[in-house]
Amino acid sequence: MNRFFLSLFLGGALLCAAAGQASASFRVHLQDGSSHVIAPAKVEQSPAQAVVQRALSTLGTPYRWGGSSRERGFDCSGLVNYAFKKVDDLDLPRTSRALSRVDGPKVAKGQLEPGDLLFFRIRGRSVDHVAIYLGNGRFIHAPSRGNTVRIDKLSNSYWSKRFQLARRVMPEGTQLAANG
């Protein structure tokens, strides 16, 4: 019976911890006089999830050419650099064209995963726009002057016509930076 209540209590404590409701460990006293210390579970976040979450935190931030902060605004590559800032061992270049040439496999549209970079050709003959894939055919980007960081669909005819390639810049085993 005590094990049942302990299991029930532990399960509830873990759920609360995973939901962010518990922040400190606590002691459980059982009827038989024994006690157990329960520490909240830490839910680990993958680097790709961290990139997506950090990018989503910028939604609505104004576009600014050369911008790379929430306070001053973002251009497309500034947003990518901001979102990837906490990923260990990634030193990304600052322009969309240079980002399109970084190490990492090209990814087919049907194989996209959250955190993959999407590259577009808006004007001219080479890549000049970059975005972060979110999943379910959606991506986040800083589109252009007069706009804000927003989410668009890759299936939108404007974007699908201009899509050039996708690249996975976080190889398996990539970690979050120690301070991140």
Mark where each language-model region is.
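Catalytic cysteine-centered active-site loop
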Residues: A39-K42, T61-P114
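Stable alpha-helical elements in mature extracytoplasmic
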Residues: P47-V51, A55, C76, V80, ...
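Aromatic- and glycine-rich peptidoglycan recognition patches
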Residues: N2-F5, S23-V43, P47, K106, ...
